[in-house]
Swiss-Prot record:
PANTHER family: PHOSPHATIDYLGLYCEROL--PROLIPOPROTEIN DIACYLGLYCERYL TRANSFERASE, PROLIPOPROTEIN DIACYLGLYCERYL TRANSFERASE. A 1,2-diacyl-sn-glycero-3-phospho-(1'-sn-glycerol) binds at residue 137. It is found in: Cell membrane. It comes from Halalkalibacterium halodurans (strain ATCC BAA-125 / DSM 18197 / FERM 7344 / JCM 9153 / C-125). This is Phosphatidylglycerol--prolipoprotein diacylglyceryl transferase. Belongs to the Lgt family.
Amino acid sequence: MEEMIEPLDRVFLQLGPFTIYWYGVLIGLGVIIGYVMASRESVRRGMPKDTFSDFVMYVIPVAIIFARLYYVIFRWEQYADDPIRVFYIWEGGLAIHGALIGGVLTAYILTKKRQLSFWQLMDVAAPSILIGQAIGRWGNFMNQEVYGGPVTREFLEGLMLPEFIINQMYINGTYYHPTFLYESIWNFIGVVVLLLLRRVNLRRGELFFSYLIWYSIGRFFIEGMRLDNLMIGDSLRTAQIVSILLIVGALLLWWYRRAKGLATERYLDPHQPARTNGNKKKTKKKKKK
């Protein structure tokens, strides 16, 4: 039976010399759905119109570049002999932690320039980021990557998985854990959790911290099952180290901002422009008069 199993076609569409892969289509779909969610929520929160459409133009390209650089840095041995392959992103190899670094840095710079609340923006974006990740993992599925250790077909059938998933997990003569699916499900559940937390009316920044904590917990354990890990040396899994740092960092920032009285505004509070030094000086001058 196994001899007849063929992997799903990675190509979504062929237009003359141009090939569109499922990997890019699914990542793009995740970005679009995430953008629509965030854009609608930003309007409900009273943020300036077209805030997210403006930000997406900068954040997404930078996030993709950082995602690729992050991956290539930890897998340079694959590209050293043929560096042009660094640009072959349709083959896979975009690291979410790299995308987060690039995206968050870009968002921080833009919010400061436009006098918007960075924490409000990240809170609004948090569920959208997670749903984008959940959908994007199916791009890994189409590429037959992000899989775990070997298992039997009976094990996969016991999970009540559809036939097409079971067959796609048959790689080079062996069945593997569909860790892409575990993470995708974890992320979809996380989206629901974050949407429920919106109603709790956390202080600004704390919904984003909740996202970092939720995603990192799942990623830490699922990463331990994977065989294609990015590594530091021979024994340290990069994603597990970064996940621990994100959890600790999010908890510390959560505590620090509350302890220092920096987290005064809440998620459901109406939008207000971010305070700047210039605004503070003007306020002081008015008081003197």
